[in-house]
Curated annotation (Swiss-Prot):
It comes from Fervidobacterium nodosum (strain ATCC 35602 / DSM 5306 / Rt17-B1). This is Elongation factor Tu. The lineage of its organism: Bacteria, Thermotogati, Thermotogota, Thermotogae, Thermotogales. Residues 81-84 are annotated as: G3. The gene is tuf. The keyword Hydrolase applies. It is found in: Cytoplasm. It comes from the Bacteria. GO terms for cellular component: cytosol. Belongs to the TRAFAC class translation factor GTPase superfamily. Classic translation factor GTPase family. EF-Tu/EF-1A subfamily. Its main location: cytoplasm. Its EC number is 3.6.5.3. Mg(2+) binds at T26. Residues 136-139 are annotated as: G4.
Length: 400
């Protein structure tokens, strides 16, 4: 019999475990649910249950992700864990499960490894706001100075990728010992889990809700209402909009057009305000039907700008995932689906030493679109060719 759902009275936050394979991400996830279950704040989810992660689809890509939930005194957490390295890469690039904070798991026996670096780099590129380190398997290292060394290495690595490596919390423990500990919250083997949760509560900042960000709505459709003017429809991506507010139409050229949203409607009813997540129609003052089109965005003036050239981290689908069967090189020209825009672009540059990109690769490349689109760092998009998705990307740097 399933337990009733948690009552959501506490602020909610999305977190996840990241790090190198076999460093203990999944065991740590299990240990957290075990500890919280002792207070009735979670259902204990053992390792085996987390490890057989169900498949999800995001932007045409199949990803295995496990979601668990637990609470502390302060917050309600939704926690994601992925079984395979490729699943992490795909999740972070598609944004299938967003993270407001990440727990970087590093084994004391190994220190930072290649996937540790890759996950940290991606966390930086997709704007994960904060990171906490859990040094795992400390019971398997006899010399505490070795653990100190691992901690220094991890802090250096995080600083290199612009996280506050000197300041962020580093917890030491053994996830396996915690899972195997008796059901006593004061047991010494569970102390590290308590420390980790306390650090999450105090160090992870409250997420900025989408409604608190500047208004932005991708244009899905445009039509004219006789005698009233031009209406654009779409789903508000962030922020709040009220009638009478100034907005900009951005995209398709470097010129942006100012307008005033004179009316906001939902299901043919006028609204005093609409917010992130709402599907609405906005009546635009002084805009002809041919001055606005699908693929542009309506946004708070000055909050986002149009660009043609940018760097992006792209995961290229494998043949088995429905992607390309062959590699591509510089000069490849697929379609980029950026919000509602469907625009041709060219891969104008690849990293030094990379001649071709193989299906299954994850590569940072430079892209130039044929016309400017409203773009910002950390934004996700799909890469398509001949009607099928061949890749998923995230903008890592704006060039022009």
């Amino acid at each position: 019999m399933a337990k009733e759902k948690f009552v959501r009275t506490k602020p909610h936050m999305n977190v996840g475990t990241i790090g190198h394979i076999d460093h203990g991400k999944t065991t740590l996830t299990a240990a957290i649910t075990k500890y919280c279950s002792l207070f009735g704040w979670a259902d204990y989810t053992p390792y085996e249950m987390i490890d057989k992660a169900p498949e999800e689809r995001a932007r045409g890509i199949t990803i295995n992700i496990t979601h668990v939930e637990y609470q502390t005194e302060k917050r309600h957490y939704a926690h994601i864990d992925c079984p395979g390295h490729a699943d992490y890469i795909k999740n972070m690039i598609t944004g299938a499960a967003q993270m407001d904070g990440a727990i970087l798991v590093v084994a004391a026996t190994d220190g930072p490894m290649p996937q540790t670096r890759e996950h940290v780099l991606l966390a930086r590129q997709v704007n994960v706001p904060a990171m906490i380190v859990f040094i795992n398997k400390v019971d398997m290292v006899d010399d505490p100075e070795l653990v100190d060394l691992v901690e220094m290495e991890v802090r250096d690595l995080l600083s290199k990728y612009e996280f506050p490596g000197d300041e962020l919390p580093v917890i030491r423990g053994s996830a396996l010992k915690a899972v195997e500990a008796p059901n006593d919250p004061n047991h010494p083997d569970l102390k590290a889990i308590k420390e980790l949760l306390d650090a999450m509560d105090s160090y992870f900042p409250d997420p900025v809700r989408e409604v608190d960000k500047p208004f932005l709505m991708p244009v899905e459709d445009v039509f004219t209402i006789t005698g009233r003017g031009t209406v654009v429809t779409g789903r508000i991506e962030r922020g709040v909009i009220k009638p009478g507010v100034e907005a900009e139409i951005i995209g398709m050229s470097y010129e942006t057009k100012k307008t005033v949203i004179t009316s906001v409607e939902m299901f043919r009813k006028e609204l005093d305000e609409a917010m992130a997540g709402d599907n609405v129609g906005c009546l635009l003052r002084g805009v002809d039907k041919d001055e606005v089109e699908r693929g542009q965005v309506i946004a708070k003036p000055g909050s986002i700008t149009p660009h043609k050239k940018f760097k992006a981290n792209i995961y290229v689908l494998k043949k088995e995932e429905g992607g390309r069967h062959t590699p591509f090189t510089k000069g490849y020209k697929p379609q980029f689906y950026i919000r509602t825009a469907d625009v041709t672009g060219e891969i104008v540059d690849l990293p030094a030493g990379v001649e071709m990109v193989m299906p299954g690769d994850n590569v940072e490349m430079t892209i130039e679109l044929i016309y400017p689109v409203a773009i910002e760092k950390g934004m996700r998009f799909a890469v398509r060719e001949g009607g099928r998705t061949v890749g998923a990307g995230v903008v890592s740097e704006i060039i022009e």
